[in-house]
Amino acid sequence: MTSSAPGSSGPSVDPAAVRALVDRARHEDVRLVRFHYVDPSGVTRGKAVHVAQLASRLRGGVGLTRAQNAINVFDDLVDIDGLEPVGEIRLLPDLSTWTRLPWLRATASVLCEQLGHDGADWGAVRGRSSPGRSRRWPRPASR
């Protein structure tokens, strides 16, 4: 994913990369693509997209209600301000993470980050595009 141009709405994706991935999906006989993300509880969750809609979903992402991030590890919806079922964020895929799933017929997956419609962090979950965010895990404090 590349950054969006000033004044545009949302992040932009290289059209050639999208075409290449759609062609790869057809070549690999993929019919469903799982858009995976990790919620604040550390649980991997996702939404599936049919290959017929893959190009548009790779470009614009997949909609996700903010309330999905208020579901705990027991699948209970926790009442948290700002994580109501009204208001949507986007699951924006990292095209380099495309993986054909060998244990599921005709299925692939792609890892996503959660962003607002404008491509910026939406507040509850910081994406890798966050300014000043370290890409390394913090070292544990020495005892």
Go through each PLM region and give its residues.
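ATP/Mg2+-dependent ligation/transfer catalytic cores
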Residues: 1-143
